[in-house]
Amino acid sequence: MDYKHFKGKHANIVIEIISLLEKGVKKAQEILEKPDAGSYTKLENSSGDTPIKADLVLDKFLEENFLSLENIKSVFSEEKETPVTKENGSYLIAYDPLDGSSVMEANFLVGTIIGVYEKDYKAQNLVASLYVVFGHKIELVVALDKVYRYGFYQNKFHFIETIVLENKGKIIASGGNQKDFSSGLKKALEGFFAENYRLRYSGSMVADVHHVLIKKGGMFSYPQKKLRKLFEVFPLALMVEKAKGEAFYFDKGVKKRLLEQSVENYHEKSECYLASPHEAQILEKYLKGE
């Protein structure tokens, strides 16, 4: 893989992680392809979810590989209660080993989300994020100074494009239970669909955000506090912001950046809106003051 796009203080650790993923992505795909990979275990993870077999196997595989990197001090999976920490290193990884596992049995797109933090697990310390999506093809998207998209072919990641969102998109990925939506959100969604926006929600956050990114605009929303800040929300918020979009939530009717949220406990959850500028403006118009 050509690493010419990666420059600056945190480029080296991103390159190390990508190199590791490039070597291990076929093994990860093999884990997902096993006939019983989507079977549920009898366990409950720290977030209260029941993992499938592939969650646990992929988690162990990724943890071992991340810990092998000299510059990584701590590795933290959403499947674990607390981080695994080493003596040396300055970077911390928080990751969701298999986002979208609940729809994997339907053969929907799933993926691994990775957040790279410096010194502490805080939104303000997030320096880069990556995700790999697994489907009929494998893709990698990286956010550092900009957002870069790669396709996996013949054992290597090949550059596809730099992703920049347009001011206005055409797709909406609206998650959550609609009966619990606020009146403002319902009106905003009705307005979008009246303008011929297309609904593209699969139940896999990484897949839906990936769709918004590669289509160069639109909106992903999950108004209930279900998504985990460290493992899902912050990494994908950084991704959207670096692509010239907006990542936000509403606090008593006031729009605020997701990446300015505090983290009181490791598995804390948040509502989440990721959008192009136009969609963000419309949402603020309808949800302001609610």
Task: Identify the function of each model-found stretch.
Residues 39-64:
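N-terminal, Lys/Arg-enriched amphipathic/low-complexity engagement segments
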Residues 1-34, 56-290:
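IMPase-like, lithium-sensitive Mg2+-dependent phosphomonoesterase catalytic core
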